[in-house]
Amino acid sequence: MRAVLAREMDGRRVLGRFWSGWRRGLGVRPVPEDAGFGTEARHQRQPRGSCQRSGPLGDQPFAGLLPKNLSREELVDALRAAVVDRKGPLVTLNKPQGLPVTGKPGELTLFSVLPELSQSLGLREQELQVVRASGKESSGLVLLSSCPQTASRLQKYFTHARRAQRPTATYCAVTDGIPAASEGKIQAALKLEHIDGVNLTVPVKAPSRKDILEGVKKTLSHFRVVATGSGCALVQLQPLTVFSSQLQVHMVLQLCPVLGDHMYSARVGTVLGQRFLLPAENNKPQRQVLDEALLRRLHLTPSQAAQLPLHLHLHRLLLPGTRARDTPVELLAPLPPYFSRTLQCLGLRLQ
């Protein structure tokens, strides 16, 4: 298995290449042949500002987030700096948390600045298009292509892999709570429901054929607990279906909402230390509430915790090789600084 890995060294990214053999030097390392779901991932080097060095955050924002009120030019510059690999028509980004891929006309999104990004990267003949991307609230890999034929081939590959239940995407998540099982499958029927002006993903028990025809979808994810500590867990998640907020809702169904989930975490209630699910339809989105012990461990005040970004990161993608029998190509995106800081505070490691 060949890999692409970008790491930050003294503020500068070191870029790897794929499909063209190993590029020796910093940031590019071979990964084990057993690079499936149980692969031992490499622990990201802790950035400056980790818990052991700096303690409380003070009034500083969480490191690794996009500044608010960016101009189009500033967003293009930020995305260009987020490029972790270029090969042929493919461009891979490590998307910051909070940046939407698409949106309403006039909104600043990844899609809206693709023409400028294409020009900035010197792609004049063909404009970049999105092949695969993490959602707005999650961070991580975005795969772009300037070749429509390549984009179509990759999209067919991802579709066939899902039908065969072969995971191609691996997310890292930190959860508030520890799943009862160390690994397994999460299956749930989900639907989108408009509640108080917001589109929310809602579980559906025992969906009927009519429900399926009306948009209810059966969803499936694999999960594996990598490490636990301080009542939290580092979990690897592999979605085998595609649905809005699927991974967040799946972890809520495990009574372990993702840290920084201010959309669905209120569906988990606690009485006398025991967690239980509350009716999704009756629970509006609200800021996630963390207990005092966890706040102390994270060196956060309640007001800071209310701004905690979602700790859900598209860490790895598998792509087909150049020939049918080639081993898959692995793309890796390093964790955001705020994510690494949380792992440090909780004593969690990607083993």
UniProtKB/Swiss-Prot annotation:
Give the GO molecular function terms: pseudouridine synthase activity; RNA binding
Annotated region (Disordered), positions in chain: 33-58
Enzyme Commission number(s) from the entry? 5.4.99.-
Q: What is the lineage of its organism?
A: Eukaryota, Metazoa, Chordata, Craniata, Vertebrata
Q: What is this protein called?
A: Mitochondrial mRNA pseudouridine synthase RPUSD3
* Subunit annotation: Forms a regulatory protein-RNA complex, consisting of RCC1L, NGRN, RPUSD3, RPUSD4, TRUB2, FASTKD2 and 16S mt-rRNA.
User: Its encoding gene is what?
Assistant: RPUSD3
**Leading EC class:** isomerase
| Stated role | Catalyzes uridine to pseudouridine isomerization (pseudouridylation) of specific mitochondrial mRNAs (mt-mRNAs), a post-transcriptional modification necessary for their translation. Acts at position 390 in COXI mt-mRNA and at position 697-699 in mitochondrial COXIII mt-mRNA. As a component of a functional protein-RNA module, consisting of RCC1L, NGRN, RPUSD3, RPUSD4, TRUB2, FASTKD2 and 16S mitochondrial ribosomal RNA (16S mt-rRNA), controls 16S mt-rRNA abundance and may play a role in mitochondrial ribosome biogenesis.
Q: Name one GO cellular component term.
A: mitochondrial matrix
Q: Which UniProt key words apply to this protein?
A: Isomerase, Mitochondrion, mRNA processing, Phosphoprotein, Transit peptide
State the compartments where it is located. Answer: Mitochondrion matrix
Family recorded in the similarity comment: Belongs to the pseudouridine synthase RluA family.
Feature: transit peptide:
1-25
